[in-house]
Design a protein with these regions (language model features):
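Core transmembrane helices of Major Facilitator Superfamily
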Residues: 32, 64, 124-136
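Intracellular juxtamembrane helix-capping segments at the cytosolic ends
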Residues: 39, 130-144
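Glycine-rich segments within core transmembrane alpha-helices of 12-TM secondary carriers
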Residues: 63-67, 150-169
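C-terminal ends and interior cores of transmembrane alpha-helices
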Residues: 78-79, 90-113
């Protein structure tokens, strides 16, 4: 058993780094569960065919291929935002600022009457969320010591599941 696993949870939760990791995990779980689970249930209730649901489900593809643009997230500076927040948090903030309206616009679409627009919104939410995940994972590795990675990963996953639960998945 390493030293980090012996630290009481109360001590861990007082550390602002670990609280940030939990809340970033929560922010990650909210949109991803929308794209993976809640979306297909909603489309089924709207009476869409299984083929249409399957095609819209392909919008989750960015989660599987986000490693392709991870180097850009790692190196591309976001102007003054990077200067104020740093490389990782600027990407997280930028993704959050774009995710909120994308989720709202997706929610305002009727899949029955504007399936293409709805599908594009789902793809955009997925892309932004997958990009945010890249930045969140990099941030976690950057702010923690190697012996804290396990606790950090546990809190991130707990946060993710909390976010997924909150969106009804």
């Amino acid at each position: 058993m390493d030293d980090a696993s012996k630290v009481p949870w109360a001590t861990i939760l007082r550390d602002p780094r670990f609280r940030a990791i939990f809340f970033f995990g929560l922010a990650s779980g909210l949109p991803s569960s929308l794209v993976f689970a809640t979306l297909s249930i909603w489309l089924r209730e709207e009476g869409l065919s299984r083929t249409s649901i399957g095609l819209i489900g392909a919008a989750a593809t960015p989660y599987a291929i986000n490693f392709l643009w991870a180097p850009f997230v790692d190196r591309l500076r976001l102007g003054p935002l990077t200067g104020r927040l740093g490389q990782r948090r600027s990407w997280i903030m930028a993704c959050q600022l774009m995710l909120a309206p994308a989720v709202i616009v997706m929610g305002l679409q009727s899949p029955q009457t504007s399936l293409l627009t709805f599908g594009f919104c789902a793809l955009l939410v997925s892309f932004l969320s997958a990009t945010q995940d890249v930045a969140i994972d990099a941030y976690r590795v950057e702010i923690l010591k190697p012996e804290e990675y396990g606790v950090g990963a546990a809190l991130a996953i707990y946060g993710w599941h909390t976010g997924a639960f909150l969106t009804g998945a």
